[in-house]
């Protein structure tokens, strides 16, 4: 049995795909197949029942209008504006009005006194299957992550482990105020693994983008995984789970890094079923290969693609992203910690691109978005100050806290293809809303609402979370979650995974 950090280092990229393989030749969302139900049943059985089956406490009455009353409202919509004190009316899961003194006698009232009311955070890139491996690599580099998380653990994941990881990650996101999350899911060792991930997202109640990716293998050669159906199984997923884009969980394709010969067939598979694309690029020295120039030569770059990290892209590649209408996701905490390169915040801005933000891996970084905002806010300011100290007479402007908050909300919605539905508190949009307490010692007395959110708050300030008008968290507690069962689910999944991977779990 090996210790956790005994795994051999690897030269693969973060997606486990540096080698070039041969070219690859509705609203009723929870309509899972009998096979997927059988696959997942063991999870509920071993946990003493499903972790989410409990009479909700703090939930509102289904179908009844909700009036969020008397909060400091940050709509982040220029037409709507912000209000020192105002109300938000929700009808049919959508925002119907944002203004002071709304009268709605039949609505259920949520008192927002001493709270900031704002759009929920939007995460554009998180490997949610790793939710049962939190904190496993606090000191790890990118190479350590590949060797330990992907090769050692990922290759041994069962469908039950995938379910547990995704479910934990989704609940953690909701708890910290993230109302929409892109699951960059590269754990599809079999179709049963895929069904498990989809079911977990649906069961969690999160608004999610399921980005279907490759398998994990002990040698990193995912394209040789015998049980995997990637990327062609995306056609089944579209038909079985994602026949409509107007549902709580929607479909993307997570394209692997590597050569154009590897990537192009996955792009084609996505576009054949009308799915958007997300891909890691510009990661460390491995990212200095001019990949986007090569893909552009094949006319593969379009506005349907989100580019993650982008730390070591060249100027031409940045121009290609801008000119083709692509979006960018920056995971500043991970990028500085694991050796991806400097987070390209200023580079994106200089290129005319407003980035979105993402957590990336909970194996090494915290899952809350407040940390992500503060990381990029401080790094951009540090870069500007460094230029000034070096004698730059025309340095960039400092980011404002409002811009950072927009990166965490509407720009995330844009990258996830959902900016028409979420990201601001505009009447007609879905009611993805969070209420943040200002009567806590880390922020009171509150003097600047946007500044408080970006520079002072944390998950402990998240009082209430609504997704599509449904209350998911209230009074600081998740609604309808049995935590005793949840603890058992996590412990059993973790212990099973360590055993299957032949790794000794050393917790100190």
Predicted region positions:
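Metal-coordinating catalytic core of metallo-dependent amide/deamination hydrolases
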Residues: 54, 192-318
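N-terminal secretory signal peptides
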Residues: 1-25
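Histidine-rich, glycine-flanked metal-binding segment
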Residues: 33, 43, 50, 55-67, ...
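Alpha-helical scaffold segments that flank or form the walls of functional sites
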Residues: 134-206, 230-246, 491-496, 502
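His/Asp/Glu-enriched, well-ordered alpha-helical/loop segment
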Residues: 299-300, 345-440, 455-457
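C-terminal cap of metal-dependent C-N hydrolases
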Residues: 430-487
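Active-site gating loops and adjacent loop-to-helix segments of metal-dependent hydrolytic enzymes
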Residues: 132-162, 217-231, 285-304, 324-327, ...
């Amino acid at each position: 049995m090996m210790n956790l950090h005994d795994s051999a280092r690897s030269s693969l990229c973060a997606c486990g795909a540096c080698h070039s393989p041969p070219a690859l030749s509705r609203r009723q969302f929870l309509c899972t197949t009998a096979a997927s139900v059988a696959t997942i049943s063991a999870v509920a059985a071993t946990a003493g029942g499903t972790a989410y089956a409990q009479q909700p406490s703090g939930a509102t009455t289904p179908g009844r209008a909700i009036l969020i009353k008397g909060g400091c409202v940050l709509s982040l919509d220029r037409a709507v504006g912000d209000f020192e004190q105002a109300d938000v009316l929700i009808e049919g899961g959508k925002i119907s009005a944002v203004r002071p003194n709304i009268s709605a006698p039949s609505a259920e009232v949520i008192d927002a006194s001493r709270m900031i009311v704002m759009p929920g955070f939007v995460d554009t890139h998180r490997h949610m299957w790793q939710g049962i491996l939190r904190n496993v690599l606090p000191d790890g580099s990118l190479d350590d992550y590949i060797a330990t998380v992907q090769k050692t653990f990922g290759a041994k994941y069962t469908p039950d482990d995938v379910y547990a990881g995704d479910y934990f990650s989704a609940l953690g996101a909701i708890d910290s105020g993230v109302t929409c999350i892109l699951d960059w899911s590269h754990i599809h060792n079999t179709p049963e693994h895929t069904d498990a991930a989809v079911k977990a997202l649906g069961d969690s109640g999160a608004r999610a983008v399921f980005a279907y990716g490759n398998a994990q293998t002990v040698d990193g050669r995912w394209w040789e995984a015998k049980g995997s159906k990637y990327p062609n199984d995306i056609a089944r997923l579209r038909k079985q789970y994602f026949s409509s884009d107007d549902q709580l969980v929607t479909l993307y394709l997570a394209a692997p890094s590597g050569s154009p010969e590897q990537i192009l067939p996955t792009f084609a598979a996505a576009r054949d079923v009308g799915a958007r694309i997300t891909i890691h690029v510009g990661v460390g020295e491995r990212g200095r290969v001019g990949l986007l120039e090569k893909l552009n030569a094949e006319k593969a770059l379009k506005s349907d693609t989100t580019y993650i990290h982008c730390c070591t892209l060249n100027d031409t590649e940045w121009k290609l992203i801008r000119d083709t209408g692509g979006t960018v996701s920056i995971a500043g905490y991970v990028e500085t910690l694991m050796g991806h390169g400097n987070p390209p915040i200023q580079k994106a801005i200089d290129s005319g691109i407003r980035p979105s933000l993402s957590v990336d891996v909970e194996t090494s970084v915290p899952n809350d978005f407040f940390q992500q905002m503060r990381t990029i806010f401080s790094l951009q300011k540090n870069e500007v100050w460094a230029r000034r100290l070096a004698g730059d007479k025309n340095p960039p402007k400092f980011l404002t806290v409002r811009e950072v908050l927009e990166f965490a909300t509407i720009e995330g919605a844009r990258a996830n293809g959902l900016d028409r539905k979420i990201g601001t508190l505009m009447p007609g949009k879905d009611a993805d809303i969070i209420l943040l307490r200002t009567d806590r010692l880390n922020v009171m007395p509150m003097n600047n609402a946007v500044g408080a959110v970006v520079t002072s708050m944390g998950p402990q300030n998240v009082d209430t979370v609504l997704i599509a008008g449904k209350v998911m968290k209230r009074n600081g507690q998740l609604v309808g979650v049995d935590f005793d069962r949840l603890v058992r689910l996590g412990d059993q999944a973790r212990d099973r995974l360590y055993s299957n991977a032949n790794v000794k779990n050393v917790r100190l």
